[in-house]
Amino acid sequence: MLIRFQRDGGLVAQLKLTLALDTSTLPPDERSEIEDMVASSGFMDLPPVLEGDPKARDAYTFTVTVEDGDRSHTVVVADSAVPDSLRPLISRLTERAKQQRRADSTGQSVP
């Protein structure tokens, strides 16, 4: 499974986060956990756009694309509109993207 993640917006818009994650490269436990999060969120059945409060201009917007075999789906979701079922995956991908950014700045790799 390939997951592409991007977080835009927020108070400091230049702190965009991006991540490309191939779950086949992860340790088995982490791979299962992330793939289970995708499945339990109903990701492939979510609408392509979930809009939040238009007044929340400083809110984050997340773009997540999941490719799994011959299936591919992209969801763009405002922070205020993230369904409860999707929030664990968004949190995990955000943390992973932050780890990757830190590793890139120090020349290390993320396990």
Predicted regions and their residues:
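Function-determining sites in protein domains
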Residues: 1-111
